[in-house]
Amino acid sequence: MREAPFTVCVIGGGFTGAAAAIACLEHVRVPFRLVLAEPSAALGRGVAYGSHHPLHLLNGRTRDLSIRAGQPGDFLNWAFRQLDQGENHAGLHEGLGHTFLPRQLFGEYVRQRLYEAIGRRPDIDFALVAEAARDVTEERGRGYRVAFERAEPVRADIVILATAYGLQTSSGTGALAPFEAVPGEHFARAQTILLIGSGLTMVDVLLGARRDGFRGKALVISRRGQLPRTHAPRGVVPQNVALPRSRRVSMLATGIRIACEMAQENGTPWQAVINGLRASLPELWQGLPVAEQARFLRHLRPFWDAHRHRLPMEIHASLMEEFASARAELLRGQVKGVTRTRAGFAVTLLRRGREAETLKADLAFDCSGFRPDLEQPLIRGLTEAGLAEPDAHRLGLAVEPSGQILGKAGRPSPGLYAIGPLCQGTLWEITAVPEIVRQADRAAQAIATSAAPAEPSLEATAASS
């Protein structure tokens, strides 16, 4: 018999943490204690869906997003009711499913679904700790102790790391973080802004700067010169692809390219092929030798990201107009250093076949993407204790498909899970809504098994009769 109720502590209360909490509330059917640790007031939103700007749109269609496993149309149904269209208008319902709604609206949906899930479980004890977890230590035979700066420590049977990218928001280049608060008048006065990276974050910053009054030139630096592609005009049915059985990433890349070309020849958008690959990507990734995975990361990742992480058509059109009108310029090269000056920023750029050059800008933003911070105290403490290990590429932590963290010598750490982007190095396709929800659901099912009371043994039953 337990001295205290079975306790699950979810560290991180953005989208990933909300998905983990909702899944546990769905699957763990015994009374338990749920602790959610999140210092931000934007519960359920996180960085991804915390924007309050109505023109910051989701990069996935409404019909494809849901925080509830097995209910793919949940966000669409919720949004339809919010827009007060009445669910009997099937045509409007279908049309809404193909749209890209504001991220703020999705954040509201996640937050509401989280509190609804809590409300449906009067048998649980829910606690919100408005702080970031500082340390997680193992207590032999008693689970884990989660420590905070000021709040009382929490003893937990299960700890789920759901900090998305581990609280790291830039690569430490010296440039501004992508969503760092910059007064609008600074954009209005700026003649040049420089953006390191050419993915979705760059698009947010560039178009946001325009909305805030920036009228000057934008310099976009990209090692491979790739920009995000556009979604198809309407949602496409994912197309199953028979790829060659190969442990070489070059063969797989060729197979994907040929499949996209054949789809287009048959009148099917290439986006259907990319969408069809998503479910099988973790298996494909794990089937590659580490050296081949590293080759993909060095050479092919920018091309994959440009086709996988796409833009709504209207946003893509605005981006293309920036370059067509020469208000923005794409420079292929590698940033070797960023220095703050009295006038702004000096960025050292190395382009192929040229000597290093210095570019000057009034503002410089690191848009190279979020990445896990494996050196933050929380993660470092786990690795030093042998409870966790970085994956082979140091993109995150080594995990099993369910998210159970692998510690020293590849041994699973009982009761310790990571969900979402912290698992990217192991599972690869684990940064988008559907994949995070599926992984959270798998983890919650495993947790439910450990939470269930043990069946009495035959000997105990016989002795009591």
Task: Name these PLM-found stretches.
Residues 52-76, 236-251, 314-317:
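N-terminal glycine-rich dinucleotide-binding loop that anchors FAD/FMN and/or NAD(P) in oxidoreductases
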Residues 80-84, 110:
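Conserved phosphate-binding loops in N-terminal lobes of ATP-dependent enzymes
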Residues 457-465:
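Long, low-complexity, intrinsically disordered segments
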Residues 53-69, 73, 87-107, 114:
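Dinucleotide-binding Rossmann-like beta1-alpha1 core, especially the glycine-rich loop
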Residues 1-41, 45-47, 90-246, 256-451, ...:
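Flavin (primarily FAD) cofactor-binding/catalytic cores of flavoenzymes
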